[in-house]
């Protein structure tokens, strides 16, 4: 008998035997088997069969438990294993006879249930009492099988295979579970046209990730439900197949193929009533092929696809289609391509407006129309690595989620007041132990203060709860209204006009009036509210900023003032280069005011001048101004790119070369942080081909890396530095205008015209004057003073000492760098020796003064170093 049992039948009989041992029963009865069938894992086929004859599962289980409890039990250490009772043998014999009658090769759990109903004695009576007679069960069993025979050891997993391995999208549309699909009429019409063909009626939707391929299929499901399709598709079921579920748990070779064959047979038996949908269609190529087998899912589908027996809609991305589907021409020719293009910003706004109600109901917040417009436009401009409408929908969803989190969290006023109350309570406990008069008086004052704050806290908390209730009330009403509209639509579709009229002319208008009243009440509360209840354009901009680091929101008053004073801020670090500071400041202001060219970098400059005059320092100061960190910039030393083959390191090695997967040093840095300062230092030392790469960046604000990805440079400030012609700038015999002209001539002879023509500005840094060196000396001294302050040392430097530093450190050919070295050697080195020797201790004041042609460094008490 074992050889004829299916896997689940064997498991059920073993479980029944174990139950008999546990209960101490000498006989294995049909009641044990019935309980095992009801309580086993993956027993949905048994429960579905009993549900089909409207039997009460709980009552059947209770009846079987009662029978088992009434059986005689045997105790002792030498109890023999339970033996099948006469009734049990009769049940198995009846099950075998029924299996033979139905032409089945294996004995399944359904056969055993039929045997219990027919020959199970008391257990059969329990089933009969619940309306599950052998005759009714056999009819339900035949209907569920659909004419298929049991020819494998796992037939139970094959019944209702389509239901098990698929999701009915038309049922979801009927229940209002799918989001509305706005637009995409042309794509849906093309899909319907292909599905209406006689053969090869299989459209495949191809497009970039996030453009709405799955939404097109959901739109088709909604049209089928509404009847807005040709006769050939009316009343059809659109089922999304889950290949992952088919593969999951397929332990043995051929198990996946068996499941897929069962699904395909069920689709074929439906006589064209089922249209299938496979998302990520490329997964069918290679799915299920194990070892040396060539029979993957794609090859199993081909015959039915070609004959028109299987109407299938696929969806995949352009890259996956090219890599997987096009490599199998026999599979490709069975599908008809439907290209789903990225919608425009205007179309995306329309889509967002259609989805707005769903997101408002889910998050229980209001979403302003300006937020939808901002989501579409800002995502299109700043999130270039993804596609509309998906990225815009994500922005709205996350902004609404943030606001909901803020609403559910305590407002700042309540939080601060609660902390204050907690502090006063702790203080009260501490002072309460004191008995002196001063402490008692302080305790009295503290308790009065605590009572006032607790009363204020109660008032604020009550107000906050009221505001939250008002917000939640509006959200709940919107959700209920959405649900009732769905019910009304279903009632109209099903011809239940009585229910539809009750909803449309009774409940829905009442609910709309309640919603209007609740919204008005909310507006009253909102005039002086503690919590914000509407997602606005600024919230969307905040999400964009958190994703990309790009400040896309409106300028706050403090930031406006900061930008207007940008020259002063940069001038605190960069001495004497007014033209360069103004050029960079103007570029940043254009960008933040929103009037910069959106298709070019924020600014691109070539800084020219002798060494040590502040070219690199200005780039650092700019990064510090924008990001509060001078290291927050992409700095590339172009002397490392002096050879032709090293150019590929900027954008990444081409395919087949070492480092292909790593990406380029320039492109990867900007891709990770699109709003940044890019400093290309000493560009004249780079190979000429580097400038050919930069042409695209300077003109269109984009660059394609070694892996074919387009990197967006439109939010970067590009700074290139060079020493070309610096010998003219330090020549004291020529005027300023002539110096600059000579430098520009050298630059024009060194760089191609098309490169120079794309730069926003060529900024010539002038040599530093004596006065400017004095100011730089003060900056260097201030830096040293800050480092000494960490050791609680105070540094005092006289004006005479500063003048000496400026004189001694003045070398026009080398700029301010000799001055930095002089401060380090003349002051820093001496201080280091004395600190280590203990001559200067923490808390001392150090004085630096000039004595003749020397610098005197010593404690303020007068001792020199």
Curated annotation (Swiss-Prot):
Chain residues that bind ATP 1: 207-214
Gene Ontology CC annotation, any one: cytoplasm
Region (C-terminal) residue spans: 768-865
NBD2, as annotated region: 559-767
Pfam families in the record: AAA (PF00004), AAA_2 (PF07724), AAA_lid_9 (PF17871), Clp_N (PF02861), ClpB_D2-small (PF10431)
UniProt feature coiled coil, ranges: 393-527
Keyword Chaperone attached: yes
Domain Clp R as annotated: residue spans: 1-147
GO molecular function terms listed in the Swiss-Prot or TrEMBL record: ATP binding; ATP hydrolysis activity
Alphabetical UniProt keywords: ATP-binding, Chaperone, Coiled coil, Cytoplasm, Nucleotide-binding, Repeat, Stress response
Residues annotated to bind ATP 2: 609-616
Region (Repeat 1): 5-71
NCBIfam families cross-referenced by the UniProt entry: chaperone_ClpB
Family: Belongs to the ClpA/ClpB family.
Name of the protein in its database record: Chaperone protein ClpB
Gene: clpB
